């Protein structure tokens, strides 16, 4: 695969289904990744069904390679309530899945950063969900153990990709005191 990556914003329900499906395709047959329930994913990501959209907005993106294959996905989320409470201008990224290609992961992160900047945000944090009740975080060890359907599972290369894209070094909320 070459590094010609297009980032496509999701604007339809069909696109949202494709966004959700990518996770299943990426981890198909993986013995430690436990798939999320599709209807839970759809209910969480659908603005008409998730009450968090009363104070959040989101944009979903897919990465497509030069052969029109989907090679990654990411959600950009702005939680206006949290930003107001913490006096921040943060865009969150979540639902971050990608093939092992740094051009893909960095292009997806840039898409969220740019979307956030267009909405007045000045900091990108994640992986996070709409609220602290959603799955969040990144697996950095324990790749040889089964996950649960409530914990993000990711391939070991995710950490290296985030470090390469210069976003992994942000302190976590726990480290901020």
Regions inferred by a protein language model and the residue ranges of each:
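A short helix-loop-beta-strand connector motif used in the catalytic cores of GNAT acetyltransferases and
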Residues: 47-62
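Short amphipathic alpha-helix that is part of the acyltransferase structural core
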Residues: 2-48
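Acyl-donor binding region in acyl/amide transferases
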Residues: 83-166
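Aromatic/hydrophobic pocket-lining residues that form π-stacking "cages" and hydrophobic walls in ligand
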Residues: 19, 112, 169
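Flexible loop/turn segments at secondary-structure boundaries
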Residues: 16, 70, 80-83, 132-134
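Alpha-helical subdomain
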Residues: 49, 77-81
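Conserved beta-strand in the GNAT
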Residues: 62, 69-78
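Single conserved hydrophobic/aromatic residue that forms the stacking wall/gate
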Residues: 168-177
